[in-house]
Structure formats: C-alpha cells, structure tokens
Amino acid sequence: MSATSKSTTRTYIAIDLKSFYASVECVERGLDPLTTNLVVADKERTEKTICLAVSPSLKAHGIPGRARLFEVVQRLREINEERRKAAGKDFTGKSYSVKELEQHPDWEIDYVTALPRMSHYIRHSAKIYNIYLRYIAPEDIHVYSIDEVFIDATSYLSSYQMTAHELAIKMIREVLSETGITATAGIGTNMYLCKVAMDIVAKHIPADKDGVRIAELDEESYRRKLWDHRPLTDFWRVGGGIAQRLSMYGIDTMGKIARCSIHQEELLYKLFGINAELLIDHAWGWEPCTMELVKAYRPENCSMSSGQVLQEAYTYRKARVVVQEMADAIALDLVEKRCVADQLVLSVGYDRESLTTPTGREYTGPVSFDRYGRKVPKRAHGSINLHRYTSSSRLIGEAILRVYDDITDKRLLIRRLSISTNHVISEDLLKQKTAKPIELDMFTDYEEVKRKKQLEDAELARERNMQETILKIKHRFGKNSLLRGLNFDEGATAKERNKQIGGHKA
C-alpha cells in the first residue's frame, strides 16, 4: 500500500546516477568512476559516433556528456598540447587516471573506450531501483529514465524520523555501497523544484568525499537563487527553440518570464499557446502535477516510432531497403503489443555531403544548418492515412514506401530515417468502436464490395497468423533467427540492429 499523504505540503526527491553508463564500466574494471577518464562508445564505428556517456573527469575538461567521439579526441589533443608546452618537453608517459596525471604533469592525458552494453546497464538500473524499493513504495516512485527517478517522500519522513536530506543520502549511500555508483539529488516542494535543484543548484555546490551533491529548493529560495540564472536552457523543459523565441523580446531569465506573466501574459500565450501555462508556472516555481497524477495518467492517443542514424551516407535506393525493414519491424511491434494504427509519418534526413556530389550540386531546394553551422538539405517529411486501423506489414510497408518515393529527393544522400505510427489504439478498443454508417448510392455494387472485403480480411488474417508465428520464433531463438531476403540486400541494417538496444550494442 502506498504511503502517499493527502497533505498539501509535499516533499519530493529527484535522484540522478552520476554518469551512469560510464560509472558502470569503471566499476566493472575496478576503476574509480570519479577519477578515471572513460568514454562509452563503439569505436568500431566512425569517430562521428555519439558517445553514450563520458566520465565526470572528462566532463571537467569541457567535454559534453553526449559528445561525438571525434570531439573527445580533438579536445584532449588541445589539452595535451597545452600540457606539453607547460612541461617544456615531450611526454614521458600517459595515463587515464586523474590522480596519476596530477602527480606527473609531463604525462599525456589518455582515456579508456568502453563498448556499450545496454542490457547490462538495464540490469544495473533494475538492481538500483530495487534498492529504492527498500525504502519507498513503487506507487511513490516515478522512473524518469534509466538513471533518474522522482520520489514522493512526503509520508516517509515522519515514519523514518528523517529529513528529506537524510533519507536521500541514506538511499544514495546504499546504492554506492552495493554498486560503486554515486549520485546527485535534488529536494523540492514539488516535482519541478526537486528536478531543478538537482540539475542546476547541485552542480554549483561542493561534493562530499563520495562525489555526492544534494541541493534543496522551495518556491522562495528558487526565486531568490535562480530567477537571474542563465542560460534558460539549463531549466527543465526549456529547449533552444523556446529560449530563442523569448530572447527576441529581451527575456533571458525565469525572473523576466515571471514579470512578463504579470504585465504581458498575452505575449507568452501568443508565442507558445497553451504551453505558456506550464512555462509561467515554472517561472514562479509552481508545479501542479503530483506523483498521484503521474501514476494515473493514460494518454488518449499515442504513437510508436522507430528511427536510426545510418553509419554512412546512403543513396536513395539503399535507404529504401532500410525503410522497408523499419516498416516491417514497426508492424511486428504493433502485433506484439496488440495495437493498431491508421496513420504513418516518415522523416528523411539528408547528409551534408549531398551538396558536394555532382547530382547534389543541382539541388536548389531549402537548406538548414547543423549544430556546427554547416549547410544541410532540409529534412523531408510526409504522412499517409491508411483508411483503416491495421498492424499489417504489407499495408504498412506499401504505404510508407509510397510516402518515401513521393517525398525523397533522389539526387541527395540520406543519413537519417524515422517512421512514426499515429493514432495507435489497442485491438480491444478497436473492437468496441462502432462501425461508421455508410451512405448508400445507386451506382455501387455492394455485393462486390462485400466480396472484396471478405477476401482482404481473409488475406490479412493469414498474414496475422504468419506475423504471430514469426514473433514466437524470434522470442524463442533470438531476433536474427528468422530473417527475410530483404535483410540481406545491400544497405540492410536490421540484422545488425537486432543485436542492439536503443541503437547501441546490447
């Protein structure tokens, strides 16, 4: 039974495991996660591959948590050049240990590269979640991501006769003792404040001997400490687009958003519509959403999506194979979840090298800029209505290829693909939906319409039986135990992606 209280004043704790993937890999190697230079990345790919994580000691050198591997190499090359000049001689050794590098200024900074192991990280995350469950009921824990949770600690503080800080540190110490992984925590009077305390305030306070940082905020201290904080993108749910639109009106802090909500509230609603309400609440440190509401939430409509960044630039024909594979996979996913959808959306992202090829130079369409300011042909987007709810691989595959052929510029090279299924509902809900009335006319042969529908339904039933058989085989013998001829075509990626979780090695 949940210990959730009905009192108005609540206490929330957010806990974020520090550089989780990198910390797991350090601990597995008997290394200190806080003093070891380590990146989690598949170096078998190109240096453009995204690092799944970097250790805290590398972050201290200005390397972002989701850097590309070449950015790590480039930054360390710059730092090592500075170290070599300071030493006044060539390096006499190298190390990935911060402690050793401090003792030997004439050594080169090195780092460990760990291959991603997603299934291993998931097991570690589950183990840590079970540690939280020793203290908190599952109804009062919201798993935000593989390495982050929200906890409604309101009713547990009196039971344990602890402050929120004491309860947080007790759980974090237990996680550290059993896994070797440390954490950062935020405490607040609502879910927004505990998140911001963790993300912003905790980063600016000294860590204890185990690297633990815990910060606390209420509405008053939030306004006092963070109303003038910059940049706005440090705040939860404020992305670059929102910050950019606000900056056009001279608004670059939460304090200015709060003041604007008093005198020019209509401006915020003009810019962001209904989302302005959330932005205004957060500017004042308010958050009406409780743990109880989070747990009770069920979306009326949902979607399923699949996306991938290709390992190299693909031609139109090669990428078409991948689109077919993705459509087949998403249809099987719908069958497995006993769901159906009636709309598909396709997004095609082009490679920047497209503009340098002989055919690409002919391109005169719209361009955008990547994160490095380089010109890239603008993404292509398209959607199609299926005119019926379905999980058929055939119907979904045929429809998405029509969209692909229609929206894709055949002259350009392709780097990114994503497919979304919209208006996803359960098969049970579909059965409850009443059939729409048909407007009869004198020129339609309804017997022929009925006959065609019966034939199509029979064909779809046969396909459904085949899909369920495929799923049973894959569940028992592995995803690659049954492959289509398509999966062996040039450019096919399904066989390799079946060995991955979230685009990284399982």
Language-model segments: which ranges?
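Gly/Gly-Pro- and Ser/Thr-rich, intrinsically disordered tail segments characteristic of DNA damage-repair
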Residues: 1-282, 287-291, 442, 447-506
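DNA-contacting surface of Y-family translesion DNA polymerases
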Residues: 14, 234, 240, 244-414, ...
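Short, charged/polar surface micro-motifs in flexible loops or helix N-caps
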Residues: 20, 44-48, 350-355, 424-428
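Short aromatic/hydrophobic contact patches that present stacked aromatics
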Residues: 150, 385, 418
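A glycine-rich phosphate-binding loop feature that marks nucleotide/adenosyl-phosphate handling sites
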Residues: 189-192, 281-284, 340-352, 413-426, ...
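C-terminal hydrophobic structural anchor segments
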Residues: 402, 406-465, 471-472
